[in-house]
Amino acid sequence: IGSTFHALKQNLFVLLHLVSKYSEFKMMPTVTKNLIIINVLVFFGTLVAQRYGIDLANYLGLHFFLASDFNPAQLITYMFMHGGFSHIFFNMFAVFMFGPILEQTWGPKRFLFYYILCGIGAGLIQEGVQYIQYITELSQHTEVNLIGYGIISMDQYLNMMTTVGASGTVYAILLAFGMLYPNNQLFIFPLPFPIKAKFFVIGYAAIELWAGLANSAGDNVAHFAHLGGMLFGLILILYWRKKSKNNGTYYN
């Protein structure tokens, strides 16, 4: 265990060293930079804890609100947890790409407020979707026959309904960029041509809605949390725009 911990610690310091030396990262606005650092630290903390048999996702991930392991603070902590390297990489890459633009446009306080509130909103929408699933499919049962686990109690099953990740907030960030800079051109792999940001956002939202409604077997992605982040982002941006116009100023 000692050698494993030492290796993880070395990898962590190497990664943070590379990140801190990366010129664009050094020039990044404070809130965006610190959000990425916090997410990376929590991710490596999760890996270290796993080596000691501790599942941080069980404490910091967002449980279904009727589960015994639910804690209201999880509506905040869950957005700093990630389920794997690709999960955190793509989320933080999006924050790295679009976060600085929004922070420079809005200022650090408004950007941080937007980030956290949309993450909470995404979690609330996910909770609502899970509640509908519970009412329509689970509430009449006391046990569940789950593949790979056998027959388990309903409380055990509800505690397994855990959401982690900043994806809801990331989708809100994409929405904000599309609303503030709708005609900016973006190159999206694998498309060989650029598309306007507004079409990019609409396309992503449509894909998430389709995937959420399809509810394919084995799909563990919280699609409605992504849409929830976008919904709360839309409401907040429209509110800010209306408030700015009422104050005699124009808000982009």
Where are these regions (language model features)?
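A detector for small-residue-rich transmembrane helices and their helix-helix packing motifs
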Residues: G2-N252
